[in-house]
C-alpha cells in the first residue's frame, strides 16, 4: 500500500495465517488474557504493545482468537479505554513534539513541513471519526488545547 504524503511505497510484511480457532499448543484462557490486558493497560502500555507482550511473553498468537474480542473491545467493555482513539492520540503527541521542537528551532523548514503533514493527517482522521460517530461533531483539533486533551 502506498504512503499518504510521498511517492514511495510502504513496507511490505508477511501475512498472518488464517485461523478460526486458537491453536492446540496455546494453553491460556480467555479470562486470563482479559486480566493480563487490563493489567498491562493500567501500567500505561499501548494496545499494540499489549498484543506484542501477549505474543512474546505469554504465547498468545492472537487475542481475538482466544477471547473472541479485539484488545480495544476488551478495554471498552471494562470502561478503561479513552474517548479519543489511540491512533489519533499518537498523531497529536507527535504534533506536540514537533511544535515544541519548532519553538526552539525556528528555521527548521523540514520539520515545519512534517508538522503540516502530521496536522493534515489529524484533520483527516478527525473527519473520519466524526463520520463513524466515534468523536462528537463539535470535536476538533486545536494545537493550543491539544496538550490538555491528551493529558486528561
Swiss-Prot record:
- SMART domains in alphabetical order: Ribosomal_S13_N, Ribosomal_S15
* Any one Gene Ontology molecular-function term assigned to this protein's record: structural constituent of ribosome
> What GO terms describe the biological role, i.e. biological process, of this protein?
translation
Q: Where is the composition biased (Basic residues)?
A: 1-11
Q: Which keywords are on file for this protein?
A: Ribonucleoprotein, Ribosomal protein
PROSITE patterns referenced in this protein's UniProt entry, alphabetically: RIBOSOMAL_S15
| Top-level lineage group | Archaea
Q: Give a GO cellular-component term.
A: cytosolic small ribosomal subunit
Region of interest called Disordered, as start-end residue ranges on this chain: 1-22
Known partners and oligomeric status:
Part of the 30S ribosomal subunit.
Family, according to the entry, reads as follows:
Belongs to the universal ribosomal protein uS15 family.
The protein's name in its UniProt record: Small ribosomal subunit protein uS15
Tell me the organism.
Answer: Methanosarcina barkeri (strain Fusaro / DSM 804)
- Name of encoding gene: rps15
Amino acid at each position: 500500500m502506498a504512503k499518504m504524503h510521498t511517492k514511495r511505497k510502504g513496507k511490505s510484511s508477511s501475512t498472518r495465517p488464517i485461523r478460526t480457532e486458537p491453536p492446540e499448543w496455546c494453553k491460556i484462557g480467555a479470562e486470563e488474557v482479559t486480566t493480563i490486558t487490563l493489567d498491562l493497560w493500567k501500567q500505561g502500555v499501548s494496545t499494540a504493545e499489549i498484543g506484542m507482550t501477549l505474543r512474546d511473553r505469554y504465547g498468545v498468537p492472537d487475542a481475538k482468537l482466544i477471547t473472541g474480542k479485539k484488545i480495544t473491545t476488551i478495554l471498552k467493555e471494562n470502561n478503561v479505554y479513552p474517548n479519543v482513539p489511540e491512533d489519533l492520540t499518537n498523531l497529536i503527541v507527535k504534533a506536540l513534539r514537533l511544535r515544541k521542537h519548532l519553538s526552539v528551532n525556528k528555521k527548521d523548514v523540514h520539520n515545519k513541513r512534517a508538522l503540516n503533514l502530521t496536522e493534515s493527517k489529524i484533520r483527516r482522521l478527525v473527519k473520519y471519526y466524526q463520520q463513524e460517530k466515534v468523536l462528537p461533531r463539535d470535536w476538533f483539533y486545536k494545537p493550543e488545547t491539544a496538550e490538555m486533551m491528551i493529558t486528561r
